[in-house]
């Protein structure tokens, strides 16, 4: 999931280390066990930017393919990313926190600056999400259902009721 954070006409991005070098990305990451997509987005935004973030809308669901060439210790990789992008309200900077491992810095870019830096983006979804946001695309968070089995750590057999 990814947080598309706009404030006063600029977008909050992170500059992060990747196997392809330093890249720009939206605050984004993966699900941890027991959390919903919205909770994961809030957590990732905080870990990567040190800002509180409150998702108000689902911006969209995106897929992109990435091919990483072979390296000395790894074969070619063909990776498909599935991104749930959320937009919402920027909260306060949490003084005393540090940026997540691999994040070099945060930066605010205007739409034109973001477009001009496309070669440095981690994926084409960075630009696509911004353009969709600027077009006013929004979906209600109620579109996403998180079943209670996600939060309940007890094992559930197929066919059991939670």
Sequence positions of predicted segments:
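Charged phosphate-binding loop/patch that engages nucleotide di/tri-phosphates or the phosphate backbone
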Residues: 129-162
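Residue-level recognition of beta-strand microenvironments
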Residues: 58-61
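Short, surface-exposed beta-strand-loop junctions and turns on beta-sheet-rich folds
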Residues: 19-21
């Amino acid at each position: 999931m990814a947080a598309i954070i706009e404030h006063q006409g600029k977008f909050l991005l992170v500059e992060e280390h990747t196997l392809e070098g330093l890249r720009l990305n939206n605050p984004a990451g993966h699900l941890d066990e027991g959390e919903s997509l919205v909770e994961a987005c809030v957590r990732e935004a905080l870990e990567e930017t040190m800002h509180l973030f409150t998702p108000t809308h689902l911006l969209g669901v995106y897929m992109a393919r990435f091919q990483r060439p072979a390296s000395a210790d790894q074969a070619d990789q063909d990776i498909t990313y599935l991104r749930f992008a959320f937009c919402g309200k920027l909260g306060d900077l949490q003084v005393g926190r540090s940026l997540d491992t691999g994040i070099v810095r945060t930066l605010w870019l205007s739409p034109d600056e973001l477009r001009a830096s496309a070669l440095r983006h981690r994926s084409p979804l960075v630009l696509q999400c911004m353009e969709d946001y600027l077009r006013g695309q929004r979906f209600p968070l109620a579109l996403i259902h998180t079943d209670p089995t996600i939060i309940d750590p007890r094992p559930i057999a197929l066919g059991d009721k939670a």
